[in-house]
Amino acid sequence: MLSRRRGVNTTMTTINHTSAGEQRGKKRLIHRFSWVSLLVCWLIWVLNAYDREMILRLGPVISKEFSLSPEQWGNIVALIMVALAVLDIPGSIWSDRYGSGWKRARFQVPLVLGYTALSFISGIKAISHGLTAFVLLRVGVNLGAGWGEPVGVSNTAEWWPKEKRGFALGVHHTGYPIGALLSGVVASLVLATFGEGSWRYCFLLALLVAIPLMIFWAKYSTADRINTLYQHIDSQGLTRPATQESSHVAKGEGMKTFLRTLRNRNISLTAGNTLLTQIVYMGINVVLPPYLYHVSGLSLAASAGLSIIFTLTGTLGQIIWPWLSYSFGRKRTLIVCGLWMSIGIALFYFATNMPRLIAIQLFFGLVANAVWPIYYAMASDSAEERATSTANGIITTAMFIGGGISPLLMGWLIQFGGGWENPAGYIYAFFTMAGCALLGMLLQLMTTDKTPRKAH
């Protein structure tokens, strides 16, 4: 114990030798441990997004192989996506009880390896050749992936000073549009190279990346590193995240903490907005690939590749909007993004040719992914220190419930409009999504902004 403490003090020597006057005059720095943890959590999030979004890119080819109607496909996607919501709140409570910082990082390792291994198995045709077996495996994948999301968000926040939390979560969540983009690129390449019968190959990649990444993360996440990091944060005049002791949720307190967090008006209203926004985000992912294939007449490979154009600006939006949220305020930022999203999704009505489709996707993409880190930051700002992961779990559950509702609704609307080949159903879907974004914005109007004062 003494030698470990000496190791921490030795590491901190170069930091603490700076005089108080010099510290006040110099720019506040972020420790390399924060950057490394952000990179690892970002890569985990890329894998999560890639695997989760892949089934949406493959919608037309899967529907074709199993002869599924729009409503049947919507029901299947809803079942798979709602599985994301099942374990994230109990898993978040368990994660809070296990501990924060380096302990939560260790908690991630078997979780990520578990759901990526199931995904790998779903890519083996000998095992997943039947629709039932494939769907059950994908449900298993999403049970783990949904559990892992709030854990990953909380872990990102716990390696960064509170004043920089919005930035860190914004960068972290750029992993989602990158993962979604990769899902379209890989799906297009696999279908074009190996043929439509080989679509399962797309699910083999995530585990191959996860194994070395999780081995590194298990070795890197230590008590010494987190203690060194927190001392550095103190020395920079910034606010450390909740300490391991204060953030620890005692056994038997989990449900009380959850109910108390759920009664928080800011968190519950933001969760409502999250649910409605996810109907929009999941909806465009469900609707766009079949629209491009059945209505626009593109190939299966092209429809998979061109349905992710909005992720190009989505990455940019996830950096800009969370950064602006510190000076503009979380509440105002979410209201502006909600209005932008409503307009952007309604504009798909005018996407009658390829240049318009690309331009509208790029406009919509500027806010499509931007809101998620701000939702999490809003919940983290409003939650008790020891309930950060629980608050994030509530946001995530609302998101996943919206993700389960959306495919049901979109499949029904496409079927109601005349089926896969009729553009009317897609138009109904676009305007329904625009209404959901507008309603979510109205819910956010009733919240109170608790954005921490920006550090100078």
Language model feature labels by segment:
Residues 172-225:
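Helix-loop-helix hairpin linking two adjacent transmembrane segments in secondary transporters
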